[in-house]
Amino acid sequence: MGSLTNNDNLHIFLVCFIGQGVVNPMLRLGKAFASKGLLVTLSAPEIVGTEIRKANNLNDDQPIKVGSGMIRFEFFDDGWESVNGSKPFDVWVYINHLDQTGRQKLPIMLKKHEETGTPVSCLILNPLVPWVADVADSLQIPCATLWVQSCASFSAYYHYHHGLVPFPTESEPEIDVQLPGMPLLKYDEVPDYLHPRTPYPFFGTNILGQFKNLSKNFCILMDTFYELEHEIIDNMCKLCPIKPIGPLFKIPKDPSSNGITGNFMKVDDCKEWLDSRPTSTVVYVSVGSVVYLKQEQVTEMAYGILNSEVSFLWVLRPPSKRIGTEPHVLPEEFWEKAGDRGKVVQWSPQEQVLAHPATVGFLTHCGWNSTQEAISSGVPVITFPQFGDQVTNAKFLVEEFKVGVRLGRGELENRIITRDEVERALREITSGPKAEEVKENALKWKKKAEETVAKGGYSERNLVGFIEEVARKTGTK
């Protein structure tokens, strides 16, 4: 992709929360802007910088050329270690801590850029750092949000925040929810941060903070595509300035971008093993970068995988020192029975795995990144949601996009999925009429995803239109 006329002086500044699931789409967006000829800075707490450097074998934060533009990193000390030392990590305490320190650190960084001749043209934040909009407003810098969930989830949060439709409450926890342009959501299909029984109310509170600041954003960029959620997008466009620009991971890669990713862990080499497997025989199993399953659930999954006799590539993350999780243990006879039809890794290059011809299906937690990557790669799914928007995504994958089969309904079920259920789902997604149906549908979505990010496609036009809007606001065009 080439640069846009007269936009060489535009400087887009992206601000991220910690967490691979939010850093990855921000980095993809940054690369997309840079490939259009813009200067892009990605900023986040230093812990993000530490993990990205380690995973990508980087020695410093030198700018990276992408097309005719540039992307660089500016990580900042959030002061967490000096205040909390070796105390167990508490995400809600950290969110509030970052709110306070970020409001102090960000203006200093922005003013420094102005003094050194690279003033920031636009601030873009993700929903877990709503305070960035306040900083932008105080400095009169145009501000936008990159929404990294579906438009369906955005609609749920918007209608909840404004009290426009009834949602589950403490006294009526099993209310189903009807939102404009959407199928009925059962009480356990609503993003569960909004449910009174959620064990993670702080995430809902934090995300809803973005909706209090929505008027301070001139645009809501969405990592989704119109063809996927057109009715919901049409309805929400009447209420908010939405621009779908996804799927960001499908935007053609510029070879000069070095292949740097937002991964926090080094990926294991899976290609040689996948190359050794026949076409459409391997089920990829991963529950993302945050979900950590109970040992009992891992054991049931292991036996379900063994009993299905399906080939598998299974991501089992190492335990987290920060959170204090224990390592997962596979049954003693697992490898004796699995033989060479399976491989277990600590982390994988997911985009490449899903694009590999050996991959036939994806058992996924249904995070939005994984959801889009599966659909846009033409890979059917087994939905195994846990919390947050995952339960909503699972519904759409199975009932609306028709690319998968359901394995569970999320943590509100409060049960262990059995080995028999796992075996049934694996068999259903790999052979028989259901497998053929979901594969055909997945390939249709893949084609639409490729078309929307190609030159002249709906998402690509929105991306260009956003850049032009920033240029007008800053007087550079």
UniProtKB/Swiss-Prot annotation:
Annotated metabolic or biological route of this protein: Flavonoid metabolism
Superkingdom of origin organism: Eukaryota
The protein's enzyme class: transferase
Biological process terms in GO annotation: flavone biosynthetic process; luteolin metabolic process
GO molecular function terms listed in the Swiss-Prot or TrEMBL record: quercetin 3-O-glucosyltransferase activity; quercetin 7-O-glucosyltransferase activity; UDP-glycosyltransferase activity
Keywords: Glycosyltransferase, Transferase
EC number assigned by the record: 2.4.1.-
Catalysed reaction equations from the record: apigenin + UDP-alpha-D-glucose = isovitexin + UDP + H(+); luteolin + UDP-alpha-D-glucose = isoorientin + UDP + H(+)
Tissue-level expression: Highly expressed in young leaves, with a lower expression in mature leaves. Higher expression at early stages of petals development than at the late stages.
Regulation: Inhibited by Hg(2+), Zn(2+), Fe(3+), Co(2+), Cu(2+), Al(3+) and Fe(2+). Slightly enhanced by low concentration of DMSO (below 3 percent), but gradually inhibited by higher concentrations. Requires UDP to be active, but slightly inhibited by UDP in a dose-dependent manner when concentration is higher than 0.32 mM. Activated by sucrose in a dose-dependent manner.
Protein name: Isovitexin/isoorientin synthase UF6CGT1
Gene: UF6CGT1
